[in-house]
């Protein structure tokens, strides 16, 4: 008779063998965006109620380690997450992980690993599909409010982030995982059977998420976890409120204890401790280029020193100096509106945001005149909290605050330095105000030469640098675009001339991981535009597409032979 242990082992092996045969629901599609029109009164009422709930009192955000909530209890530091539109308002007091907490989180991830990856794919998938449904229904307005208040987004920017994109990540990753598991060797010789097993990575995954997209946090933890990995997650301090809500939703959806461990804390202290563990298996990162370079170097050093059991996977998406290139044949009105959206929505705090603009001399005056007229007439200047879409006053505004004082100070320096630089001219804006919130207005700066540092430096704010090129030098300007910046994240060409489009498409092949023709360089949609850049913008593993999941599996190929040998010699060994 088979022992209970043997039966359990057979069950788990069978669960792996069935991975490629379980299909996700056929109705998986992109989550529809709620438009929040004037007539959508119910949506507005529900949103206002959630905003009021989060503004009325400060929430205590704990650590979540092995399913246990750990509060400060006067033993741990607290980080006050404030409303960037009203920096006197504390939205959440975020518990900071100690060294012991980090150690416990790593241990919890290791201890949960076997049961989690042995759980059949169907069951793992069901958790993320349910979480997506909870986000898009029961928790929709709470998630919107937490993201709007904590991260400075208007309702539309929050909707396309923490609701639609987040839900899309979870749903489409289930589909992509099913497709990946189904990829098996296409040939088996007579008397043999070949099969591929998509194992999780050995060890645990360390996920480091940024402030600017709640959905990115879902991607960073969801992709590895779905594939059977366990995760230690360090969220951004300034997105802790929405990220903690995401954690609670996953738990409600059935996520087992220890699979994802939520540990906000000092970035350097937490990261150094995690990277020192021999079972560190992968880094899944979104953030600044300099931080990613530093982590990359530390991991490489750890490999050289023999610190790790395996070669850790490194998956990262960082910064960009993204371009809009306008050809003389372009529809100028469309290019203007696209550039306003691509540059100034969410205050330019998207890694994909347009930051450099190349205009033909013959169309420059028309383009800039139209742009400035629109910016002024529509009052796209978030100079006080009463006008901010997340202050509780005007919920319909286009722009809001930048995330915190450090960002505000950096952007102010960019503006003030531009005023002193004889090779730069501020054409529009340059306003800022921190009396109540961290507000920087839309700013357009003209550079006299295409290699000025303002054409290559990422600002991560509502600042656009413009260079005017002679109409006859379109080909040359494509060369300049390709060689100006260390980044290669997003870019766009605006033109009606098909030859110009074809030339730019080919010449700028390696200048952007996401290239747009007659559209703004932001707004990638899961499953439609797989997102990620190369060069110093990251490892280009394409979040929102199927490739990203392959980075979190280790493939084992098994050959089973059904024939028994009768001789050790091959035919060619006989005379």
Curated annotation (Swiss-Prot):
Reaction catalyzed: L-glutamate 5-semialdehyde + NAD(+) + H2O = L-glutamate + NADH + 2 H(+)
One BP annotation, GO: glutamate biosynthetic process
Alphabetically ordered keywords of this record: Membrane, Mitochondrion, Mitochondrion inner membrane, NAD, Oxidoreductase, Proline metabolism, Transit peptide
Pathway in which this enzyme or protein is active: Amino-acid degradation; L-proline degradation into L-glutamate; L-glutamate from L-proline: step 2/2
Residues annotated as site: Transition state stabilizer: 212
Superkingdom of origin: Eukaryota
EC top class, as a word: oxidoreductase
Main location: mitochondrion
Binding, NAD(+): 297-302
SUPFAM superfamilies associated with the record: ALDH-like
GO cellular component: mitochondrial inner membrane; mitochondrial matrix; mitochondrion
Active-site residues from the entry: 317 (proton acceptor), 351 (nucleophile)
Subcellular location: Mitochondrion inner membrane
GO molecular function: 1-pyrroline-5-carboxylate dehydrogenase activity
Induction: By proline and is regulated by a common control element encoded by the PUT3 gene.
EC number: 1.2.1.88
Family to which this protein belongs: Belongs to the aldehyde dehydrogenase family.
Note, other: Present with 17200 molecules/cell in log phase SD medium.
Protein name: Delta-1-pyrroline-5-carboxylate dehydrogenase, mitochondrial
Species of the source: Saccharomyces cerevisiae (strain ATCC 204508 / S288c)
Lineage of the species this protein comes from: Eukaryota, Fungi, Dikarya, Ascomycota, Saccharomycotina
């Amino acid at each position: 008779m088979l022992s209970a242990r043997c039966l359990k082992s057979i069950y788990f092996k069978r669960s792996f063998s069935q991975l490629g045969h379980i299909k996700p629901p056929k109705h998986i599609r992109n989550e529809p965006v709620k438009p929040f029109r004037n007539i959508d009164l119910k949506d507005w009422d529900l949103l206002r109620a959630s905003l009021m709930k989060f503004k009325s009192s400060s929430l205590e955000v704990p650590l979540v380690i092995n399913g246990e909530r750990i509060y400060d209890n006067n033993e741990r530091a607290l980080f006050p997450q404030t409303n960037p539109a009203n920096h006197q308002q504390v939205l959440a007091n975020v518990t900071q992980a100690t060294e012991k907490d980090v150690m416990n989180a790593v241990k919890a991830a290791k201890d949960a690993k076997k049961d989690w990856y042995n759980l059949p794919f169907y069951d793992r998938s069901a958790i993320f599909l349910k979480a997506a449904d909870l986000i898009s229904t029961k928790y929709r307005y709470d998630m919107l409010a937490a993201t709007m208040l904590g991260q400075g987004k208007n309702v539309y920017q929050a909707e396309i982030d923490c609701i639609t994109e987040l839900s899309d990540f979870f749903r489409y990753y289930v589909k992509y995982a099913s497709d990946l598991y189904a990829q098996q060797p296409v040939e088996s010789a007579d008397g043999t059977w070949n099969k591929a097993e998509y194992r999780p990575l050995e060890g645990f995954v360390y996920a480091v998420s940024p402030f600017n997209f709640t959905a990115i946090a879902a991607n960073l933890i969801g992709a590895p976890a779905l594939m059977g990995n366990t995760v230690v997650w360090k969220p951004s301090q300034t997105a802790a409120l929405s990220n903690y809500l995401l954690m609670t939703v996953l738990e409600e959806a059935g996520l087992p204890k220890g699979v994802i461990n939520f540990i906000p804390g000092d970035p350097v202290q937490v990261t150094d401790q995690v990277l020192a563990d021999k079972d560190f298996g992968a880094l899944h990162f979104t953030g600044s280029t300099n931080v990613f370079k530093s982590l990359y170097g530390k991991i490489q050093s750890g490999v050289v020193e023999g610190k790790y059991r395996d070669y850790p996977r490194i998956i990262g998406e960082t910064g960009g100096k993204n371009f809009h290139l306008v050809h003389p044949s372009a529809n100028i009105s469309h290019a203007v509106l696209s550039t306003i959206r691509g540059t100034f929505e969410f205050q330019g705090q998207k890694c994909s945001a347009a930051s450099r603009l190349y205009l033909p001399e013959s169309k420059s005056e028309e383009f800039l005149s139209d742009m400035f007229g629109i910016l002024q007439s529509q009052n796209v200047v978030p100079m006080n909290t009463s006008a901010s879409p997340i202050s509780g006053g005007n919920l319909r505004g286009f722009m809001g605050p930048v995330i915190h004082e450090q960002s505000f100070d950096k952007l102010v320096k960019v503006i003030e330095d531009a005023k002193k630089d004889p090779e730069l001219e501020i054409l529009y804006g340059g306003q800022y105000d921190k009396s109540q919130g961290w507000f920087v207005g839309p700013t357009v700066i003209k550079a006299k030469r295409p290699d000025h540092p303002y054409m290559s430096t990422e600002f991560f704010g509502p600042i656009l640098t413009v260079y005017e090129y002679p109409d006859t030098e379109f080909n040359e300007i494509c060369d300049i675009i390709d060689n100006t910046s260390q980044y290669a994240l997003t870019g766009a060409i605006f033109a009606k001339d098909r030859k110009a489009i074809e030339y730019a498409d080919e010449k700028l092949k390696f200048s952007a991981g996401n290239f747009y023709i007659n559209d703004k360089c932001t707004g990638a949609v899961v499953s439609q535009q797989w997102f990620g850049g190369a060069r110093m913008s990251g490892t280009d593993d394409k979040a929102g597409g199927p490739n990203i999941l392959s980075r979190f599996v280790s493939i084992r190929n098994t050959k089973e032979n059904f024939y028994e040998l009768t001789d050790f010699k091959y035919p060619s060994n006989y005379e």
